[in-house]
UniProtKB/Swiss-Prot annotation:
Gene3D superfamilies: P-loop containing nucleotide triphosphate hydrolases (3.40.50.300), Probable tRNA modification gtpase trme, domain 1 (3.30.1360.120), tRNA modification GTPase MnmE domain 2 (1.20.120.430). Its EC number is 3.6.-.-. K(+) binds at N229, T248, I250, T253. Mg(2+) binds at S233, T254. GO terms for molecular function: GTP binding; GTPase activity; metal ion binding. PANTHER family: TRNA MODIFICATION GTPASE GTPBP3, TRNA MODIFICATION GTPASE GTPBP3, MITOCHONDRIAL. NCBIfam families: mnmE_trmE_thdF, PRK05291.1-3, small_GTP. Binds 1 potassium ion per subunit. HAMAP family: GTPase_MnmE. This is tRNA modification GTPase MnmE. Residues 219-378 form the TrmE-type G domain. It comes from Acinetobacter baumannii (strain AYE). It is found in: Cytoplasm.
């Protein structure tokens, strides 16, 4: 792959902002060694050997001192000459050193530019580059382990295996088109259809695994809603395992939206407690209800909590407040305070909806609710689950659509040229995942979300 940046040398602080014992500045590019040598006024240490050096300012005064590490191309993270300067971690000295590197010929790295260069130089594919950011942003050990698997190539290997099958299929189709004089009709003999169906099944298998990886990365947005004093905040506290929300007997205690990031059975959850739904003249409470409706509209799953003691019909409440805002499949009915009614905590069906009775205060039925939430998400990660993103699933969905088109053209019309075109589009869509086929704006969007020093 052509490296558009091969003539420039970039520099950036690679450690998080703030004070610390050590601060790392990274250089990458053809002049990295030359710039580092001018900064230290001494020969650089051997490749991959740590060397202690002083860092000098323009007037010859010492700015700082620390460790220098050199990684010659192509055996470096970016595939270029790379130098890492490990000095003291104060922001003042780090910025001063960075400014000195700019004086010596380096330019400021853009967000994700080190990883972009690694991708362009064939050191990693797009999935592995994204996995670096996902590993840094991981919110659970399971997500971190899955990101490491993607970084090590688990996801890429699966995609490349399917791509090889797809290319093999395209070769058969192209041969059938290019050699029509052959006595055997390769399009109609069943072999190409069998190969096509095998590719479809392979994509489906990767999709299933990728969906688990996407859930690990992006989690589930779960909103708790209901009438005042139904026990919404108690339920949030029970699920979160801490007293995060204020709980009183006074209706309308929660007037704003409260977010809590938790993990349920390993699934990252953003749990949202909302203001009680009721008619009110209170301006502040009205605003809280407006925000609650907004959260409900964006929820992956709504837990509609009602008080079993009050004899409320939860579906009537749902229709009154947000029937226009939520699909039935995203709604779960939670009958709370079963300890006061003598009912057992159980899961049942209520007019086609999942219905769960709990006691949030006594934590009766809470584990059953947790299991129901993760089951609703379809979350059941395996040991080899890899991290995945929405764009990966979108690419596989388009791949399946093109494969379905190819199957239709083959089975119904026996139209070789149209089959070939659909297969080409399928390969391009699947190739977007690893970067084998990528538009520049896609690359810019992906790497632009990275931190500067990556």
């Amino acid at each position: 792959m052509n490296n558009m940046h091969s003539q420039t040398t970039i520099a950036a602080i690679a450690t998080p902002p703030g004070r610390g014992g050590v601060g790392v500045i990274r250089l990458s590019g053809p002049k990295a060694y030359d710039i580092a040598q001018k900064l230290t006024q001494k020969n650089l240490p051997e490749a991959r050997m740590a060397g202690f050096r002083k860092f000098y300012d323009t007037d010859g005064s010492i700015m700082d001192e620390g460790i220098v590490l050199c990684f010659p191309n192509p055996h470096s993270f970016t595939g270029e000459d790379v130098v890492e300067l490990q000095g003291h971690g104060g922001p003042v000295i780090q910025n001063a050193l960075l400014g000195r590197l700019f004086e010596l010929g380096a330019i400021a790295a853009k967000a994700g530019e080190f990883s972009m260069r690694a991708f362009e130089n064939g050191k990693m594919d797009l999935v592995q580059a994204e996995a670096i950011a996902d590993l840094i942003d991981a919110t659970s050990q399971a997500a971190a382990r899955s990101a490491v698997r993607s970084l090590q190539g688990a996801f890429s290997t699966k995609i490349n295996t399917v791509l090889e099958k797809l290319i093999h299929l395209r070769l058969h189709v192209e041969a059938a088109i290019d050699f029509p004089e052959e006595e055997i009709d390769f399009l109609a003999d069943g072999k190409i259809l069998a190969l096509l169906e095998d590719v479809q099944q392979s994509v489906h298998a990767v999709q299933t695994s990728a969906r688990q990886g996407q859930l690990l990365r992006e989690g589930l947005q779960v909103v708790i809603a209901g009438k005042p004093n139904a026990g919404k905040s108690s339920l949030l506290n029970a699920l979160a395992g801490v007293e995060r929300a204020i709980v009183t007997d006074i209706a309308g205690t929660t007037r704003d939206v409260l977010h809590e990031k938790i993990s349920l059975n390993g699934l990252p959850i953003t749990l949202t407690d909302t203001a009680g739904l009721r008619e009110t003249g209170d301006i502040v409470e009205k605003e809280g209800i407006r925000r609650a409706i907004k959260e409900i509209e964006q929820a992956d799953l709504l837990l509609l909590v009602y008080d079993l003691n009050q004899g409320d019909d939860p579906l009537k409440l749902a229709q009154e407040y947000f029937s226009e805002h939520i699909e039935p499949r995203r709604l779960m009915l939670i009958g709370n305070k079963c300890d006061l009614t003598g009912q057992s905590a159980e899961i049942s069906d209520y007019q086609g909806f999942r219905h769960i009775t709990v006691s949030a205060k006594q934590e009766m039925g809470v584990q059953g609710l947790v299991d129901a939430i993760t089951a609703h998400a379809g979350f059941h990660p395996e040991e080899d689950t890899f991290i995945a993103r929405t764009r990966h699933l979108d690419a596989m969905k388009r791949t399946q659509l093109y494969l379905a088109e190819a199957r239709e053209q083959l089975v119904i019309f026996n139209a070789g040229e149209l089959v070939a075109e659909s297969l080409r589009l399928a390969q391009n869509a699947l190739g977007e995942i690893t970067g084998d086929f990528s538009a520049d704006d896609l690359l810019g969007k992906i790497f632009g979300s990275f931190c500067i020093g990556k």
